[in-house]
């Protein structure tokens, strides 16, 4: 009887240790989804997200479609939900195309956040936002104005697609600023590269050939901006102001050769980190309503702002925008200080 009791105790102890081990292994899991894989900008964001995951003891999976499509992102969202992920952070290719899948995920208890490019606010809890449309639209025009020093000028807009949320918001604000502050600037065309490097280069060359007297290309897209710079070099257009948003590692050779005088962005590695820290706060049931702040190691304090900062009319408890602390203009003097 005593031996039987000892065996039972040993078995229960072993079971308890096994259960404890399983509990330790069952780390929370977060999926971090870009618009597409294979683009340095998104890879850098994913690196930041995974660094934050390691610091927090959270399993962060970086995966995205090979082409920027709603169907590709929806499939990934559904797969992650079915695999039992606790949170999904997505850079949406469409403001409303992902909403049915994201709402289903939320109904199943999955925390949904967006980064880089937002959905409609009712389809997520928080948007980790690089800058308001007004901030980024103004930044684009101001960079162009630093180089276009004449009253009458011809300007082209060139970016990823006519449906992507973030870039269209920035361009809308940029065009409004041009209309108000540079009425002599003519916007001669708005064209798209659809996040494809080859198509972007072809489109950029087509713009430059079609408008030989073009003064500036404004390209707020990680593929479009280097494509515009490469097109200008291929066609030997040295007098063209080329500005926009991309990563310093991609743009460094164009800046060093003088093809691009300045361009902007934000620290996308930092954006990935903030996204995971905010998701972790949600999973830990920390207060995250408008006005609440979160201290992030190595970054500082970030605060939840209302959706109205982004021009939305939807507000709800547990819903808002977390704005990155700063944006950066890169040029010859500072570009080598950055590595992403």
From Swiss-Prot:
This is Autoinducer 2-binding protein LsrB. Induction: In the absence of AI-2, repressed by LsrR. Induced by AI-2, via release of the LsrR repressor. The complex is composed of two ATP-binding proteins (LsrA), two transmembrane proteins (LsrC and LsrD) and a solute-binding protein (LsrB). Part of the ABC transporter complex LsrABCD involved in autoinducer 2 (AI-2) import. Binds AI-2 and delivers it to the LsrC and LsrD permeases. It is found in: Periplasm. The keyword Cytoplasm does not apply. One of its GO terms (biological process) is transmembrane transport. Its main location: periplasm. Belongs to the bacterial solute-binding protein 2 family. Keywords: Periplasm, Signal. Residues 1-26 form the signal peptide. It comes from the Bacteria. GO terms for cellular component: ATP-binding cassette (ABC) transporter complex; periplasmic space. Gene3D superfamilies: 3.40.50.2300.
């Amino acid at each position: 009887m005593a031996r039987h009791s000892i065996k039972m105790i040993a078995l229960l102890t072993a079971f308890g240790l096994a259960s404890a081990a399983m509990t330790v292994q069952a780390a929370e899991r977060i999926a971090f989804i870009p618009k597409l894989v294979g683009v340095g900008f998104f890879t850098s964001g994913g690196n930041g997200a995974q660094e934050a995951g390691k610091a927090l003891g959270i399993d962060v999976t970086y995966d995205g479609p090979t082409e920027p499509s709603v169907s590709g992102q929806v499939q990934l969202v559904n797969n992650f939900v079915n695999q039992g992920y606790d949170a999904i952070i997505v850079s949406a290719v469409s403001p409303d195309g992902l909403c049915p899948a994201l709402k289903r995920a939320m109904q199943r208890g999955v925390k949904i956040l967006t980064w880089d490019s937002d959905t409609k606010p009712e389809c997520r809890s928080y948007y980790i936002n690089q800058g308001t449309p007004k901030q980024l639209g103004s930044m684009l025009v101001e960079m162009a104005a630093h180089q276009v020093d004449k009253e009458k000028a011809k300007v082209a807009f060139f970016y990823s697609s006519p449906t992507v949320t973030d870039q269209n918001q920035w361009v809308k604000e940029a065009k409004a600023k041009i209309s108000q502050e540079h009425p002599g600037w003519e916007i001669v065309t708005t064209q798209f590269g659809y996040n494809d490097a080859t198509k972007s280069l072809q489109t950029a060359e087509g713009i430059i050939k079609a408008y030989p007297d073009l003064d500036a290309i404004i390209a707020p897209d990680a593929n479009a901006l280097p494509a515009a710079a490469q097109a200008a070099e291929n066609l030997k257009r040295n007098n063209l102001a080329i500005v926009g948003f991309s990563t310093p590692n991609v743009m460094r050779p164009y800046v060093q050769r003088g093809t691009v005088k300045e361009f902007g962005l934000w620290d996308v590695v930092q954006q990935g980190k903030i996204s995971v820290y905010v998701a972790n706060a949600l999973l830990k049931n920390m207060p995250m309503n408008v006005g609440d702040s979160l201290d992030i190691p190595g970054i500082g304090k970030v605060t939840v702002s209302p959706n109205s900062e982004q021009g939305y009319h939807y507000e709800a408890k547990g819903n808002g925008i977390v704005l990155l602390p700063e944006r950066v203009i890169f040029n010859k003097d500072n570009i080598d200080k950055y590595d992403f």
